[in-house]
């Protein structure tokens, strides 16, 4: 069975034309992107690296990593977001190879081909996150690194990521997230280790509704990102 949730894909298909509008539903992704790219770049040195972006959507992260000097491939199962990504790179002049394929299928085709794999804000949108994590392990070279980000599953995350973000501040459309699909750091760590990855670091991403600014912080109660390594 394919590890694809067609209802999840449909959500983002409907919004795809606004992906690069910084005042749209995708404003949070634009706002947090520099923080995440910097965090990744500090740990791997993106320049000259061959990078795979799993669940690339409209290409916000993919383009940013390419601008840092990486050779980037972005994959997604959403046809409309990929079309937007391909159009936008014509405007921006950034070169990214985009493909409509699952991580699992690409792992069969391109094992151990990438220095770095990123999979950000994607695991909470698939039926079996552990399957994606195993595919990421297969695609990264020995000695390479894989980065994941997702949302913690606890009452605070429900309050901030769903009630706050979707209903009160309206940062995201209602129904963007399903609380049951949120992932605790302990679960993400266990799935990563089971796949063969070593967890190296974890960082939280916090939002101040008064200043409307995001920052990286030790608080992993809501949004967080982990760095993992495939040992040589």
Curated annotation (Swiss-Prot):
GO terms for MF = 2-polyprenyl-6-hydroxyphenol methylase activity; 3-demethylubiquinol 3-O-methyltransferase activity; polyprenyldihydroxybenzoate methyltransferase activity
- What does this gene product do? O-methyltransferase that catalyzes the 2 O-methylation steps in the ubiquinone biosynthetic pathway.
Task: Give the family per the record.
Answer: Belongs to the methyltransferase superfamily. UbiG/COQ3 family.
Q: What HAMAP family has UniProt attached to this entry? A: UbiG
Q: Which protein is depicted?
A: Ubiquinone biosynthesis O-methyltransferase
Q: In which pathway does it act?
A: Cofactor biosynthesis; ubiquinone biosynthesis
Enzymatic reactions: a 3-demethylubiquinol + S-adenosyl-L-methionine = a ubiquinol + S-adenosyl-L-homocysteine + H(+); a 3-(all-trans-polyprenyl)benzene-1,2-diol + S-adenosyl-L-methionine = a 2-methoxy-6-(all-trans-polyprenyl)phenol + S-adenosyl-L-homocysteine + H(+)
The residues the record assigns to binding S-adenosyl-L-methionine are: 36, 55, 76, 120
Q: Which UniProt keywords apply?
A: Methyltransferase, S-adenosyl-L-methionine, Transferase, Ubiquinone biosynthesis
Give the EC number. 2.1.1.222, 2.1.1.64
Q: Does the keyword Mitochondrion apply?
A: no
Give the EC class as a word. transferase
The alphabetized list of GO BP terms reads: methylation
Top-level lineage group: Bacteria
User: Is Transmembrane helix among the key words of this record?
Assistant: no
